[in-house]
Curated annotation (Swiss-Prot):
It catalyses: orotidine 5'-phosphate + H(+) = UMP + CO2. Pfam families: OMPdecase. Keywords: Decarboxylase, Lyase, Pyrimidine biosynthesis. This is Orotidine 5'-phosphate decarboxylase. It comes from the Bacteria. Belongs to the OMP decarboxylase family. Type 1 subfamily. One of its GO terms (cellular component) is cytosol. It is an enzyme of class 4 (lyase). HAMAP family: OMPdecase_type1_B. Homodimer. PROSITE patterns: OMPDECASE (PS00156). Pathway: Pyrimidine metabolism; UMP biosynthesis via de novo pathway; UMP from orotate: step 2/2.
Length: 234
């Protein structure tokens, strides 16, 4: 699937889902081979931009997963504030709507940061979507609708489950990124993920990047777990 472990590692985003800056720094040092880290709400709320400085000082790529979701003026202001951080990706909920997506994209200005639309959380399955949220669509159709908004707004790509990646790639092409969480290696517990696939299946389905957290960070030997994952995809 890939011609080297380094090529695989560049496409694996490890979720730095830890409670504070001290634990984050220890985790980063324990996994020097990881090139790309996801910083989510928990860690960003605990550490603020300091964690971004730590990662940039070590030459790491950063996926800032804040899932912006507010009125257009507010998401634009947030995007404008994020731009100087110099992260690679930042996320926004596509349910913000087309106007909000466009204004947030415009607010990034000349920044190299790419805006990524979150379509449907991978913890949400058909029952939750249709019965609790009262959206009368199956997850794949809903994701395609949200991906269409992101594409219209000029976003770089979307976050979707690996189960929808092929459909998105077929419609919008290779350059419209598909970043896929909900990845569970064989033998791993699915936990709270309702729409998941194995790493091999996810890349085969058309994922551009995989986001993997617990199967690596909660392993007895996280570094070995990451290396084994990369080896399995070469």
């Amino acid at each position: 699937m890939f011609n080297s472990q380094a090529a695989v590692a560049s496409k694996i985003i490890v979720a730095l889902d830890v409670p504070n800056l001290e634990v984050a720094i220890a985790t980063i040092h324990r996994l020097p081979q990881v090139q790309f880290w996801k910083v989510g709400l928990e860690l960003f709320c605990a550490s603020g931009p300091m964690i971004l400085d730590v990662l940039k000082d070590q030459g790491k790529r950063i996926f800032l997963d804040l899932k912006l979701h507010d009125i257009p003026n507010t998401v634009a202001a947030a995007a404008r504030a994020i731009a100087p951080y110099g992260v690679d990706f930042v996320t926004i909920h596509t349910a913000t709507g087309l106007t909000g997506l466009k204004t947030a994209q415009a607010a990034l200005g000349e920044s190299a940061t790419q805006l990524i639309g979150v379509t449907l959380l991978t913890s949400i399955g058909a029952d939750t979507l249709q019965q609790e949220l009262q959206i009368p669509l199956d997850p794949a159709t809903y994701v395609e609708c949200m991906a269409n908004l992101a594409h219209q707004a000029g976003l770089a790509g979307i976050v979707c489950s690996p189960q929808e990646a092929a459909r998105v790639k077929q419609r919008w092409g290779e350059n419209f990124l598909r970043i896929c969480p909900g990845i569970r290696p064989l033998g791993s517990a699915t936990g709270d993920q309702a729409r998941s696939l194995t790493p091999n299946a996810a890349f085969a389905a058309g994922a551009s990047y995989l986001v993997i957290g617990r199967p690596i960070l909660q392993a007895a030997d996280p570094a070995a777990a990451f290396d084994d994952l990369c080896s399995s995809l070469v």
